[in-house]
């Protein structure tokens, strides 16, 4: 039997999410839209008109999108007819369910574009691509489904996913990891693995059979470093904008001497570096058909022509105007969407840049009264830190 058919059979027998997690979207946590806005370098709030959920299972993620974006049309597809039948039943009571259309479709087939319809501003594929025999074909389909400025949210297994370590151990106990068969013996071995691995945050021995059958067991499971997933994406014509998990690790580089050493790496390049040093178990990535802005970090005079633009990821109260431009002020940045608080010691000239970072004026225009007294190296390093944190984007000089 072909691998694809075997995988379909898993979800026909045990549709996912399991009954315990089917809250018509209530239990599904989406990526913060403010973070997506920030790394997508948007100057206005993101409001997708059409959303595609690829590999929707019984519809929990689709209902969550319908609740978050009340004006959006949501199309959700899955290759399991049984899962789609359950999703349509849940749709009757789900908030925003009338704006969700469910279809049986294979995301590896070019027919996906025809079934899904008009292009989408947002495509989400969460926890699916790791179990697909030909991920490149799927990614090319997603490119065909996206509008030119659309984004893809991709959730895939990382190099430290439990399956990497656990599947070889299962075989040592005589358990076939290619197919899940519920038994007391299997649960006992999983409890042993839980214990020997230091009791993970979420016990696999206690997980629902539907999760175990498709995520830990099964005929195929790609658990790759971010760099390898990114290679698949680049070949399909997609540009990595950022990794949600790597975003948190960057906060440890607030010491200016440390973060300056990363220049001129983009957010995506830093994300790959973080994953090399701290391999993720699961990647939540944002990609786009449109390449990110290339900021000239190594060319200070060109950088001065860029236009700083604040994102909506942080809130902060700026100190008052006046005083020496090199006077250091304490600035606290708070982000409820990503549960982050950052405290910076910023000179007055940096405060003024933030005060006027509306995308209308270049750095040179903002600093014109005092530019000779602002060290260019300090300016570049300050802007790079704010960029990596997602506080600002630097728009091109050309409008």
Range-by-range predicted roles:
Residues 153-199:
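Conserved class I S-adenosyl-L-methionine
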Residues 13, 23-48, 64:
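Conserved alpha-helix/loop element of class I SAM-dependent methyltransferases that forms part
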Residues 179-256:
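Substrate-binding/catalytic lobe of Class I Rossmann-like enzymes that use SAM or dcSAM, i.e.
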Residues 81, 251-289, 339-399:
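Long, charge-rich, low-complexity alpha-helical segments
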Residues 50-53, 59-109:
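Class I SAM-dependent methyltransferase SAM/SAH-binding core
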Residues 121-135:
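A short SAM/SAH-binding and catalytic strip from SAM-dependent methyltransferases
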